[in-house]
């Protein structure tokens, strides 16, 4: 993939861009195999590759420059702004949206936040696309509600120019830190969730719910989890750290008793909507802390699926799962190092199969799916 910004040295986010893509995959696989070498993996499956460009469904743009000539992209530590509207990681559909948003910022008088001076209102634009429908969710991250009335008043023009904007919101982030979003979210559009679909499973994305940024690879990851679970012929499972329900909804069947747990109420609302649309009667999603939920339950499902943040599931949950002893644990991880550490603490489990999913091309990061079986 050629990137003009990388060539000029103005953006080096894709640290592995000079490395041939097959070599990237080989290096990631070698890294993963090294981490899991102590665990005697029974079967390694081939790496799931990604498209090398235009694969991201989300843009997180720092807004800088002036209200008349805003820049959308990133800030270097020295305060230098780089416009990334032509970043090759984004699909071509993003370009026209960025063009209109720059005009809109000026029309609405949304002064870009100046980090050095601690002045201005508009900090970030967060743009997410639904690959199913070609529609978008747009979030304005503001320092305060000072410009909210101006934003509302100018929205009809924006919606006329960009009818593909399905969800629009304002997030209030008052802290002078490099934090992407605050707690307060104000929905400005009729719709509050962006509709998506992977493998004929409807999914919904609300402004503050997590969603994978590489739809092609995410769909393959969910489908693989579905296929592995189907082979086990089980009838009960937990989906911990479930997000909007991507894994659980793929694995569920009319006979499956599924409980999905996620701390984000926004994400749980999306998961429940999908389950209702699919007509799943034995599926329950709850907004709770996954570790507290699991350690407070007496019943034992046949399979526990975990998809934790980068820190992993942690010692407390590892200890409890080892004691609870479900037949299977399906572990999806965005940080193989924390997963390998957790696997060491999951006593009496062996790794049946492992597959790497290249969710983040041109970087050292990747996703991995591991199926663990309890030793009798």
Swiss-Prot record:
**Would you identify the family this protein belongs to, as annotated?**
Belongs to the class I-like SAM-binding methyltransferase superfamily. RNA M5U methyltransferase family. RlmC subfamily.
Looking up InterPro entries in the UniProt record yields: 23SrRNA_MeTrfase_RlmC (IPR011825), MeTrfase_TrmA_AS (IPR030390), MeTrfase_TrmA_CS (IPR030391), SAM-dependent_MTases_sf (IPR029063), U5_MeTrfase_fam (IPR010280)
Segment forming the signal sequence: none
- Check the record and name the PROSITE patterns matching this protein: SAM_MT_RNA_M5U (PS51687), TRMA_1 (PS01230), TRMA_2 (PS01231)
Q: What does this protein do?
A: Catalyzes the formation of 5-methyl-uridine at position 747 (m5U747) in 23S rRNA.
**Top EC group:** transferase
Pfam families assigned: tRNA_U5-meth_tr (PF05958)
The cross-references to CDD domains, in alphabetical order and at most eight, read: AdoMet_MTases (cd02440)
Superkingdom of the source species: Bacteria
What protein name is recorded for this chain? 23S rRNA (uracil(747)-C(5))-methyltransferase RlmC
The EC number of this protein is: 2.1.1.189
Q: Does the keyword Membrane apply?
A: no
Annotated residues for binding of [4Fe-4S] cluster: 3, 11, 14, 87
Locate the active site: 334
NCBIfam families associated with the record: meth_trns_rumB
In terms of PANTHER family, this protein maps to: RNA M5U METHYLTRANSFERASE, TRNA (URACIL(54)-C(5))-METHYLTRANSFERASE
**Gene Ontology terms describing biological process:** rRNA base methylation
Q: Which GO terms describe its molecular function?
A: 4 iron, 4 sulfur cluster binding; iron ion binding; rRNA (uridine-C5-)-methyltransferase activity
Give the residues the record marks as binding S-adenosyl-L-methionine.
212, 241, 262, 307
Keywords carried by this UniProt record:
4Fe-4S, Iron, Iron-sulfur, Metal-binding, Methyltransferase, rRNA processing, S-adenosyl-L-methionine, Transferase
Q: Which reaction does it catalyse?
A: uridine(747) in 23S rRNA + S-adenosyl-L-methionine = 5-methyluridine(747) in 23S rRNA + S-adenosyl-L-homocysteine + H(+)
